[in-house]
């Protein structure tokens, strides 16, 4: 028997998350590990749960996530974006709540590139007038 699944892809900075929602108990698995061991920061786990909180669906779906690229913050944001997109497939009526919370918008901010002649993207060596 085929199991009902809902999929969504989320992106943030250089991280890409492929998310699958399966009706269940609210367990979140990231790259084959429990979310508590994969993302040790409690505030980042709160970020991941924001779409469920916005739609009052905490504990309704098991979440299976494959995420690669980026750091902890970027991966958490990508997972959040993917969960929000997957919840849209569950029920299109969630769109207004997710949109109001700003969870459907792809955060376009990226790291600014380093420029030649500068130490970092904008940091120049100290200027001496005389």
UniProtKB/Swiss-Prot annotation:
Spans annotated as Disordered: 111-130
Gene Ontology terms describing biological process: translation
Pfam name, any one: Ribosomal_S9
TM region positions: none
PROSITE patterns (UniProt xref): RIBOSOMAL_S9 (PS00360)
Keyword terms, alphabetized: Ribonucleoprotein, Ribosomal protein
One GO CC annotation: cytosolic small ribosomal subunit
Gene3D superfamilies hit by this protein: 3.30.230.10
Record's keyword annotation contains Ribosomal protein: yes
An MF annotation (GO) of this entry: RNA binding
Biased composition (Basic residues): 116-130
Keyword Ribosomal protein: yes
Family: Belongs to the universal ribosomal protein uS9 family.
PANTHER family tied to this protein: RIBOSOMAL PROTEIN S9 (PTHR21569), SMALL RIBOSOMAL SUBUNIT PROTEIN US9M (PTHR21569:SF1)
Name of this chain's protein: Small ribosomal subunit protein uS9
Source species: Lactococcus lactis subsp. cremoris (strain MG1363)
């Amino acid at each position: 028997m085929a199991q009902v699944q809902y999929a969504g892809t989320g992106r943030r900075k250089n991280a890409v998350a492929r998310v699958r929602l399966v009706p269940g108990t609210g367990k979140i698995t990231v790259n084959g590990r429990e979310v508590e061991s994969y993302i040790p920061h409690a505030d980042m786990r709160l970020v991941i749960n924001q779409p469920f909180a916005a739609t009052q669906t905490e504990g309704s779906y098991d979440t299976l996530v494959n995420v690669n690229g980026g750091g902890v913050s970027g991966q958490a944001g990508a997972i959040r974006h993917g969960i929000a997109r997957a919840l849209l497939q569950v029920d299109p009526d969630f769109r207004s709540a997710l949109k109001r919370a700003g969870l459907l918008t792809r955060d376009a901010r990226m790291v600014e590139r380093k420029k030649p002649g500068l130490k970092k993207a904008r940091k120049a060596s100290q200027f001496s007038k005389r």
